[in-house]
Amino acid sequence: MQPFNSLNKELLALRKQTGEICRLFNKSPSKGNLKRIKELFAQCGEGVIIESGFHCDYGNQIAIGDRSFININCTVLDAPISEGAISIGDDCLIGPNVQLLTVSHAVNPTQRLNKENFAAPITIDNNVWIGAGAIILAGVCIGDNSVIGAGSVVTKNVEADTVVAGNPAREIRTL
């Protein structure tokens, strides 16, 4: 995991600006406000649908493939550095209240006093379905065609063509 300080002035200003764009979109998810959200991202494919309640911290390290759908109240704790990038492939379905969390803090209380964040990327390959309320933690890769059960907490990589569920998420079956 790569450290960064989210409390420096530049990053605070960027988060404030991104937060305002998200707030405007969530208040009125019009095409104009959706365009502003998509412009935050490093990449946003054709036919992407994002429902209201979307929140990200920075947006500049988020890439979304074609025809992916993000349901209501998705929280993306992204980082402003490439080590905290989020990649969502083509044809993905992200359920309501899903959290994608690339950012974490030190477990050691003395180290935590430094106020540093740590980031690791999240990669969601093509045709993945993430069920409602699932939490995907930093450093996780989810393979093509996989299904993440509702309410799951994904702490480790998920192989392609696999169904996982639970806290922590465990393999249920292969597809």
Explain the meaning of each model-derived region:
Residues 131-157:
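Beta-rich strand-turn-strand
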Residues 54-64, 69-141, 167-168, 174-175:
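Flexible, glycine/small-residue-enriched loop-and-beta-strand segment within the central core
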Residues 1-47, 107, 169-172:
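Terminal amphipathic alpha-helical/low-complexity segments used for targeting or macromolecular assembly
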Residues 49, 129, 147, 163-165:
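Short-chain dehydrogenase/reductase
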Residues 154, 158-175:
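C-terminal end-helix/capping segment
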